[in-house]
Amino acid sequence: MADHGPLRPLDERLGRAVAASELPVGPAEFCADLGNTAVALPVLCVVMVWAGWQGWQGWRRRSQEASDGGAPVRWWLPPLAAGLALAAVPALVVPLKLWLARPGPPQMAGGAHDGFYPSGHGATAAVAYGVAALLVLRGRRRMRADRPAAGPVIPTVIAAVALLNAAVGLGLVRRGYHWPLDVVSSWCLAGVLLAVWCAVCDRWSGTGGGRAPGR
């Protein structure tokens, strides 16, 4: 992107085709808005409160049952790290946009026309909903110690988050807010932040279960 490589014209051609397609404008705008901080942040906050409550209850129950204490359990770390992961999005996206200064699609010519790579909305949605899903899966894993989990929870949550982020990305391109690779790059950035979140929780929370299931 920075050097106007061979992917750029292909990306812009695809973006123009999607923006001019017959995909409904209303649903596309709705999906694009799901990447807005005003939407994604409250969703994450609700999950953070739930995860903190679940972690605190589990810590208190184990403290009452165990006399030796064992390894320290930082039940507050996963939700706190989730909030910090979302806060890191603008801290990383804004400098990248200023540095690369990629022009936006034609539909954005009326406003600021530079600084569209990577997509802030795409990264916000991927991190907020992704880390919210990881918090839910982490909480469900702790609950399984007391009772079996009902149904295919893990595949359902993963599929829902993947579809949600795909819808956000498609909406951003359909409405002409971003080029396709703007969105893909934001997903890559989000993947790094989610991996860091898992590593931090695995290393310092003291409860285990920060890794993605099956890994």
Please describe what each predicted stretch is.
Residues M1-V43, L98-A109:
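N-terminal transmembrane-helix/juxtamembrane module of multi-pass inner/ER membrane proteins
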Residues G5, G26, A87-P95, V131, ...:
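Transmembrane alpha-helix boundary/anchor motif
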Residues A32-W56, G130:
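Hydrophobic alpha-helical transmembrane segments
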Residues M48-V49, A109-R215:
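Membrane-embedded catalytic cores of phosphoryl/pyrophosphoryl-handling enzymes
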Residues L80-R102, P155-L170:
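Small-polar-interrupted transmembrane alpha-helices in polytopic inner-membrane proteins
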